[in-house]
Each structure stands twice: as structure tokens, then as C-alpha cells.
Amino acid sequence: MTNVTENITCPVKRIECIPPEKIYSKGTIFPLEVGMKRVKLSKTYFCNGQEFSSLPLYDTGGPYSDPSVSIDPEKGLPPIRKSWGFQRDEKAASSITQMHFARKGIITPEMEYVSIRENQQLEEWISSFSRGGAKVSPITPEFVRQEIAEGRAIIPANINHPELEPMIIGRKFRVKINANIGNSALGSSIEEEVEKAVWSCRWGADTVMDLSTGANIHQTREWILRNSPVPIGTVPMYQALEKAGGKAEALTWELYRDTLIEQAEQGVDYFTIHAGILLEHLPFAEKRLTGIVSRGGSIMAKWCKYHKEENFLYTRFEEICKILQRYDIAVSLGDALRPGSIIDANDEAQFGELKVLGELTKVAWKYEVQVMIEGPGHVPLHMIRENMDKELAYCHEAPFYTLGPLITDIAAGYDHINSAIGGALIASFGCSMLCYVTPKEHLGLPDRNDVREGVIAHKVAAHGADLAKGNPVSWLQDELMSRARYSFAWEDQFNLSLDPEKIRAVHAQSMAARGHTEKNPHFCTMCGPDFCSMKKSKEAAEQE
């Protein structure tokens, strides 16, 4: 693993710049240290009467963004949650889930942790912020507890994943993004997948799903978990199918159950489980143009038709919940019947399954298991709102987690843009987490650069939705960017962007190619020194 050690632990290469500082905010209830990045600005900016010479940024990079931490991938990350002194098994006789404690009125370390993360040390700014007349308050541990107790938010954090830095998924919080990685029978290695997982976190992924279907599924997952500061999700059906020799008809409940327990023991934080696809839905799916495009859904459909029996994930769902409850694993109820083409969007198969997911949500909550609902898929723009409205109504306001939606079927090679457009819209309506799509979607297995493109595109979508929802911290970052842009403070512009390394390199190369070597020019190569609108606007304002 020598190469992967270098590739995942090396600092990001920067061009003549001061890297963001890693800072830690301490808890007041528990002995927590919540990591963030702090960007030092080249000047002091005044926003709404407050001075900002630096800005704390939400950081998903964990120890990888702290140059003072030495990381050995073979040993894994520090198990930070082991030192928090909250012994769940001593406090609960039957359940140790976040929802259990939330319903009991107990704040856990994870609840305080995510409240600190969401505020980013900007409580004063948040309290003074107002857009459209609505006042906003900082996130408190008590508010987090209430949202989890009501099922409107989840903290996916398996007790066996102590390396994890807790995060929260819910529509009252920052919109999150997930990055899918994983090998296939046709390519990739453990080293490559670990590298993609780590760099997903460094580029801004809030969770990572390991969707490996090829060789060494168990070992790949173990390496990823021990080196991941973000929640890891899986689709257990993939490994169960491997154990069944790749034959859907050979699957059994016992095989699947044992796979669940195996992955739970390793520390997987949330499982996608396709328990909502039923025999009654299959005739509707067979009428579609593109049928069933979910891998897990197609596996279960084949099993049901072969055995002429109901989906065992549905009939055994209470037993599944009892397993998840023991480890505090969240369930992501999979949309086995998501549309794979816009012609199939919002059909009877899709919404029929969604109603079943709502029923299963209530079952999971009975066992105090945290739930989120997976959504489409391929949906044209004008049909996206209906998906959000129906999810809230059918699924009792459980967090929605969507794959896009992709708004057209003809964007192959650019499906990360396709997905980000639909994702921005549905997130502005209340979707809690967006599953990224890379440029390789529909074409092949993504490499590290594809992962980067997918993550950043969906960070743009999530941030845009946060602005639409009036998130004060997001608005501050945009205002500071605009002030830096109008001041020609290039280094501040780089550091306040979602991908500082890329835009810094693009700017430097563009200027150098045209013979400009100025450190802080009052123009860029788009307009040049004589046609810069902001430069002329400033000059006009300064004229008497």
C-alpha cells in the first residue's frame, strides 16, 4: 500500500499560497474537538456591521486536512469517538440508537458535535442574519435532538466506526452530498478505492458509499472504514449476491442476514435496503421503457419472480431493524423502482414503492432505527417538485436522499452537470442529501479525477440550495467572495471557492500564457486590463 499511503496522506499542492489553518472548536457538554478549516483573508471585510479577517469553513477532510496529524493507512485514523465518555450500553437496556436517546430527551456527544459543525463558529453572524424578514438562530444540541426524535434528521454513526466525525442529514441543516465508489468485476483495486474514498472526503463529500461488486469486497470495505472520517454506506445485497455465486435465485434470508451482521460488525454506518419493491409493483415496472434500473431492485425482482414469493427484505424487515438497532445503523430505504428515463418518471411503479417506504419508515421508527428515503433518478425539471411533496407526505418527513435527479437522458459524459441541476432544484425544495453523479455515469467506472468532478459539481448544487433556503453561513461565504472579487483580492477568491487548487492553477496558467506575472492584477484574461467592468466601475465611483 506504499503508493496509496503517499497518495492519500500527501498535502495538497498549492501555488505560492498560505493553506487554510486547521482549527478545533471544543464542546461544552462533552470533551469534543470539532475540526474545521479557517481561511485567513488578505484584508478585513465588513459584512452587516461585522468584521471578517478570516472565515471558518465546514471540513469533511478529518485528520487528512490537519498537517500536524501523522496518518498510516495500515493502522487507520484515530478512533476519536472512543474518548467521549458516553457509554451507550450503560444508559440504555434495549436500544442504543440516536433516535432512542433523542426520544428520551438525552443529548448525545454526536448531537453536540453536529451542532458545533453546522454553526462553524459563526453564532453571532447567524443571530444577526435576516433574508426576507425571517430571523435565524444558531443550531443547538437541543434542536438537533428534537429533529432526530421526530425522524426529520439522522446522524449515521455505527458504534463500530469510532474514526467517524459525526454529521447530520436533514432538511433543517446544510444540504449534504454523497460520493459513490467501489470496484466492479471489470476493474479497480483496494488501493484505488481507498484513495478515491479519502479524496472524496478531502474534496467535500459528506458521506461515501462503497458499492463494490468485484473481488475482495470485505477487505476493500475494511480499509475504507478504518481510513474514513465520514459515514460509510453500503448495499449489503451486493455482497450477499457474491456469496450466492452471482445468482439472484440462490439468495436466502439467512445469507443476507449474515451479510448484514458481518458489515455491521465492521462499522458500516448506513445500509441501502430495497425492501419496498413488492410483487404487485412488477407489472407496472414491466410496462416501462427502461424497466428496473436499480441493481438491488433488479436482483430482488428476479428473486421474487423466480420463487413466486414476496420480497424477503419486506417480509423480514422487522428482523432487519432489530439488527440495525444493536449497532445504531441507519437505514436508507432504497428506491428500487426509480425511473431510469424521463419517460418513466413519476409513474405508478415509482410512487407505489414510495408509499411502501413510508410504511416501512414507521416500522423502523418503532425500533428507534434512523431512516432516510432514497429518491430518483431521471426526472424532467417540471416534475421534480412532485417527488419532494410526495416524499414528505408518504414518508412522514424522513430525510430525502436523491440520485440527482438527472433532468435529461442525453447528457452522457456530462451527467455530473445534468445531475447537479436537478439536485440543486430538489434540494432547494427540501431534499437533505444529494448522491453525486460523475462524468462516467452510464459509461464506465469513475477514476479519481471523475470523483473530483462529481463531488465539486454537487457541492455547487448543495451550496446553491442552501442559499435558496436562507442558510446564513452560505450567504456569508458568497458575500465575502463577492467583496474579494470586487477588490481583486485573488488569493481570497481562491480560498473562498469550492475548489481552490483548480481555480488557482487555472488563473495562474491563464495569466502566464499571456505574459502577465503580476502578483495581484486588477483584471483577468477574460477582459484584460482595459475592459474589466469591475475595474471601470470602481474608477467611475471614485471620480468626483
From Swiss-Prot:
Sites where the protein binds Zn(2+): H378, H442
Reactions catalysed, as given in the entry: 5-amino-1-(5-phospho-beta-D-ribosyl)imidazole + S-adenosyl-L-methionine = 4-amino-2-methyl-5-(phosphooxymethyl)pyrimidine + CO + 5'-deoxyadenosine + formate + L-methionine + 3 H(+)
EC number annotated for this UniProt entry: 4.1.99.17
Entries under Pfam families matching the protein: ThiC-associated (PF13667), ThiC_Rad_SAM (PF01964)
Entry cofactors: [4Fe-4S] cluster
Origin: domain of life: Bacteria
Keyword Iron (UniProt): yes
One MF term in the entry's GO annotations: zinc ion binding
Catalytic EC class: lyase
Sorted UniProt keywords: 4Fe-4S, Iron, Iron-sulfur, Lyase, Metal-binding, S-adenosyl-L-methionine, Thiamine biosynthesis, Zinc
Family designation: Belongs to the ThiC family.
Protein name: Phosphomethylpyrimidine synthase
